[in-house]
Amino acid sequence: MFKFASAVILCVVAASSTLAQHNPHWWGNRNTIVHLFEWKWDDIAAECENFLGPHGFAGVQVSPVNENIISSGRPWWERYQPISYKLTTRSGDEQDFGDMVRRCNDVGVRIYVDVLLNHMSGDFDGVAVGTAGTEAEPSKKSFPGVPYSAQDFHPSCEITDWNDRFQVQQCELVGLKDLDQSSDWVRSKLIEFLDHLIELGVAGFRVDAAKHMAADDLSYIYSSLSDLSTEHGFPHNARPFIFQEVIDHGHETVSREEYNTLGAVTEFRFSEEIGNAFRGNNALKWLQSWGTGWGFLPSGQALTFVDNHDNQRDMGAVLNYKSPKQYKMATAFHLAYPYGISRVMSSFAFDDHDTAPPQDAQERIISPEFDAEGACVNGWICEHRWRQIYAMVGFKNAVRDTELSNWWDNGDSQISFCRGNKGFLAVNNNLYDLSQDLQTCLPAGVYCDVISGSLVDGSCTGKSVTVDSNGYGYVHIGSDDFDGVLALHVDAKV
């Protein structure tokens, strides 16, 4: 009886812990994460204080923090080739990182670190030197900065069959030396690394290449982590938020369902299908059943995005900043529709897959610069600073915890819907105008369209819609309008 009771208690504790790992620990009504890809720590700290906090962003996903290999030309992917767990990269050192986390937490913006638990660096001719000056011999699986040696890795093999679980989880992903997460030593070093980040005040982790690690091994690692730091404002017993990179197109041998109980999972099908729709390959009317109706994960288990730092560089349906009108429309729908844990992308300009972040002649990452409108101008794209995107972050905050209602469509790619009695979105992805009296569900009054402008000193700088006593308003979105979307909410009422 005692053994049975103990087993039940352990199961309940484990279940509670994994459920807690789905909680992103947002402040108030905030509920959007931004990925400030390759930004420096001091620039992120300033952005939290000057822009993200004031505009209601909930958190930042930051690039990998651990020491990485130095590759010729400094491509972005060198950050995904660890040399040690020292917190020194081109984004800054441990002191810079700790200062950034503290300053962002102070203004209600949480930090989530992209962590590399699957592997170390790939082959390198001779001795490699990392960003903290640590030497390693990746070809010999020798990483004295941790330290790891050959016995801490799976035997080298190439992934040639993506339907072979053994290859996917024990061979080398694009030649990266594959750690053995079942090893007590490897587990201890990974837990030590993550716990140190928790001590510094982070709210959670994006786990890179999660599908290439056995779910049981990850479960052990996650459950062994410390609670979040109360010194950084987290409540007692708060668990780190976990979201895991698992690419699953629905026919994978290693599936997302093996990981979604451990934490949230990146819902790549969301990205692909929203790109298809707003590129015109699917009528928007079908988005009424968006989310689980499309076979996606349950809302609280799905990390959703229009694009990420990987797939924005690939050919195909995925939208990126290079198709700005469609990208802004897709992002508006993403942030308005009540599904998923939302993350928006903040990129730098690229011409090919390997393009480095903006850097100077000494290969130091440069800080973003802004024009009079607040947009980035020196190689950083900063989609999160586009009015049409940060305004939708505010929309998402204003309508939090409301249901979708009053879906309307024209039988093709003009749609609208309400979020309770707090918000309304209309989209026109047809080649002809949308001109229609539509149910907005809003109280009577005049509302500013937060896509084309904003509410300033009691008046609208862009379009406005007058809502009558029955909740109806006349909506016009021309086919050649700069933006193909209109958004109203209660915090933008004149």
From Swiss-Prot:
Binding positions for chloride per the UniProt entry: 206, 308, 343
Disulfide bonds: 48-104, 157-171, 376-382, 418-441, 448-460
EC class name: hydrolase
Positions with a binding annotation for Ca(2+): 118, 169, 178, 212
Keywords carried by this UniProt record: Calcium, Carbohydrate metabolism, Chloride, Disulfide bond, Glycosidase, Hydrolase, Metal-binding, Pyrrolidone carboxylic acid, Secreted, Signal
GO cellular component: extracellular region
EC number: 3.2.1.1
UniProt xrefs under SUPFAM superfamilies: (Trans)glycosidases, Glycosyl hydrolase domain
Domain of life: Eukaryota
Gene3D superfamilies, per database record: Glycosidases, Golgi alpha-mannosidase II
Site location (Transition state stabilizer): 310
Catalytic activity: Endohydrolysis of (1->4)-alpha-D-glucosidic linkages in polysaccharides containing three or more (1->4)-alpha-linked D-glucose units
Pyrrolidone carboxylic acid PTM sites in chain numbering: 21
Signal peptide segment: 1-20
UniProt cross-references to Pfam families, sorted A to Z: Alpha-amylase, Alpha-amylase_C
Molecular function in Gene Ontology: alpha-amylase activity; metal ion binding
Cofactor needs: Ca(2+); chloride
GO BP term, pick one: carbohydrate metabolic process
Family under the similarity heading: Belongs to the glycosyl hydrolase 13 family.
Name of this protein: Alpha-amylase-related protein
Species: Drosophila varians (Fruit fly)
Origin organism lineage: Eukaryota, Metazoa, Ecdysozoa, Arthropoda, Hexapoda
Underlying gene: Amyrel
